[in-house]
């Protein structure tokens, strides 16, 4: 079997049916599907009971990393493809993964091409296109390209996943970024440029909206790099910090624009020297200005609210 598709889920009754329907529509047949329920309390399990072709595993709520690890420990495919239970694949997705693996002589790590959407009708604009790939000796070699490899984009050799130790079981987010960095030196990284293979759903309960947990996960990336937990030593340090700060920069800005000022400033301070080393002057100068502007705006809005109450 070429692929094991592993789907962690937690209270996704609203979306998981569309996810599974997109799997059933695949034009490539050599795969198994494992869904790991992470302690759902809504109707997710009821929906899963209607899909006998899916292998369902259950655990107490431990987070998506632990759920993916459980699925990976029970799978039999040569490659593992992760899919989140609120996202969808296109009919050609697994076929595209298989072709990329074939033409590149079985690379260790392949990354999907995603399309962000809010409403499923937006997916109608996505069409199958000829295969185009960007090839690198390893993931660290992409550090100047800005390629992000989230869990739902990962297709990797099962043996490589096992050797890495899998996702952290800590109850934090950015566990996928941590794994990608630990996989930084595996043999050959392939980024799919076309066709689009993943429909990444945007909604109010997206993990990316949980700022405290993302903050803890982002701090883990910084601390892990400082502690030498990522491979490559001093020779690959600049590449690693480019990849770490690829995550810290946008998140620090998002923090200060959503009133998590302490989070944003802490990330700015902790990565300041790294940004100097990689010559990120626009960020080093721009972040304080953005933080100041939003701080003034919040203060002004608060004053206006007080004045309105006094009228």
Enumerate the language-model features and the residues they cover.
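A conserved acidic beta->alpha catalytic loop
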Residues: 22, 29, 37-46, 62, ...
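Acidic helix N-cap motif at the loop->helix transition within catalytic regions
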Residues: 14-17, 40-50, 88, 92
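Short aromatic/hydrophobic "clamp" motif used to bind/position activated sugar donors
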Residues: 80
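Glycine-rich, basic loop-to-helix element that forms the pyrophosphate-binding segment
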Residues: 59-75, 96, 140
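C-terminal subregions of glycosyltransferases and related glycan-biosynthesis enzymes
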Residues: 202-311
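Conserved nucleotide-sugar donor-binding catalytic segment
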Residues: 112, 130-217
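Conserved donor NDP-sugar-binding/catalytic core segment of glycosyltransferases
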Residues: 92-125
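Short, well-formed alpha-helical segments that are part of the catalytic scaffolds
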Residues: 12-25
